A protein has these predicted regions:
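Gram-negative outer-membrane beta-barrel domains
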Residues: 1-200
Length: 200
């Protein structure tokens, strides 16, 4: 017989989208650190698998999002041509691979999640608006709620904190007087999504 939690079991595919607010920090040796806000939108796809044990759900989930996350600090460095420039940090693709543990209240699933985050971090001065790119692997953790609203369809809202660790700006033409800087990028993501579960 079908129980109240059976509808969460199995593999699923979905779409997600949302907004991110965070910060980036540039540090060059013992020199003063530039910290500035970043923000942008995200949109992408999700794949996952749920394994319920009574009302407790264990799962794995991965997603890859196009991202417009970026930010800059004005007049933080000097280009090789001698012009003042902004230090800029960007991320144009963000992925995560996470575990999920949740509790199902019939159609409503409340969960916590955590795992790896990965994506390219672009760093450089603007002008000239050319960038070093470093692919980083960091971590992500958060929580969310998902509601099964029709058949195998569900909608979710979640919060994720993402830390992509420390990248670097090492090319003189891109980084000017900030060449050799280490650059961190952290984001607070709020996303919504729709999933379709395949019955097993």
């Amino acid at each position: 017989a079908n129980g109240p939690y059976t509808n969460w079991a199995g593999a699923y595919l979905g779409l997600n989208g949302g907004f991110g607010l965070g910060s980036s920090q540039w540090t060059l040796g013992l020199m003063a650190t530039d910290v500035f806000n970043t923000n942008g939108f995200l949109f992408g796809g999700t794949v996952g698998f749920n394994y319920p044990v009574s009302a407790v759900l264990f799962g794995l989930e991965a997603d890859v999002d196009w991202s417009s996350l970026n930010g800059s600090a004005g007049t933080c460095a000097v280009t090789t041509a001698g012009a003042t420039a902004a230090c800029e940090s960007k991320n144009n693709l963000l992925g995560t691979a996470r575990g999920r543990v949740g509790y199902a209240l019939d159609r409503t699933l409340i969960y916590v999640t955590g795992g790896a985050a990965f994506g390219p971090v672009q760093t450089g001065l603007n002008p000239p608006a050319t960038f070093d790119t470093t692919t980083k692997v960091g971590w992500a953790a958060g929580a969310g709620v998902e509601f099964a609203f029709f058949g195998n369809w569900s909608a979710k809202a979640e919060y994720l904190f993402v830390d992509l660790g420390s990248a670097s700006c090492t090319t003189a033409a891109n980084c000017g007087s900030a060449t050799g800087s280490s650059v961190t990028l952290t984001e607070n993501l709020v996303r919504g999504g729709v999933n379709y579960r395949f019955s097993w």
